[in-house]
């Protein structure tokens, strides 16, 4: 039993409309891909959903080339058909506006693709081209990152060398100042030693004087501490006899 004919009118049910759009879009992209391969034709397909979502297909590696070719062809054809200059100016502005708008939309679409979004409508060939572009971009990013890291490392090494040299110079200056300080200190000590007066020698005592000073003193009225009482009585006797002896000698001398 064959498939019935579908009535060409807007589908009111949103779910059915979305399902039909997805199926027909996939079939349309498949047909565009088949005709580009079978007939060696340059095919480009642009589809916007009712929500404004873009779906496209291009047999070339880049959609921009196809759009630029289309614009040049359309512009040349319109120039031949429109003799009035005023009309040509308006047409040029309209074409420029359309071209810039299409370019902006294309850039936005490419940006979404680079972010990994809206990849459902892209063919295998376009995915391969996108992957190659991303790999090339990653190589450039890694190369730039390595260059910056290398420059930063060299800068840190130069700074480290400068700090080490400055530290060495400061250490040398400290040692020189310490040496000068020690020299001044030694000179001051030598000057203090030279100005210091040497102690005078103690006088030598006569042994006879030491013996005489060490002898006990006579005490007429008492007893010398530490002496024997017998010795005290003998001293008193000597003192008593000495005047008598002196008197007798004087008498005989007369």
UniProtKB/Swiss-Prot annotation:
The keyword DNA-binding applies. PROSITE patterns: K_BOX, MADS_BOX_1, MADS_BOX_2. GO terms for cellular component: nucleus. Coiled coil: none annotated. Signal peptide: none annotated. GO terms for molecular function: DNA-binding transcription factor activity; protein dimerization activity; RNA polymerase II transcription regulatory region sequence-specific DNA binding. CDD domains: MADS_MEF2_like. InterPro entries: MADS-box/MEF2_TF (IPR050142), MEF2-like_N (IPR033896), TF_Kbox (IPR002487), TF_MADSbox (IPR002100), TF_MADSbox_sf (IPR036879). One of its GO terms (biological process) is cell differentiation. Residues 90-180 form the K-box domain. Gene3D superfamilies: Transcription factor, MADS-box (3.40.1810.10). It is found in: Nucleus. Its main location: nucleus. It holds the Pfam family K-box. Residues 182-191 have a biased composition (Polar residues). Residues 1-61 form the MADS-box domain. Homodimer capable of binding to CArG-box sequences. This is Transcription factor CAULIFLOWER. It comes from Brassica rapa subsp. rapa.
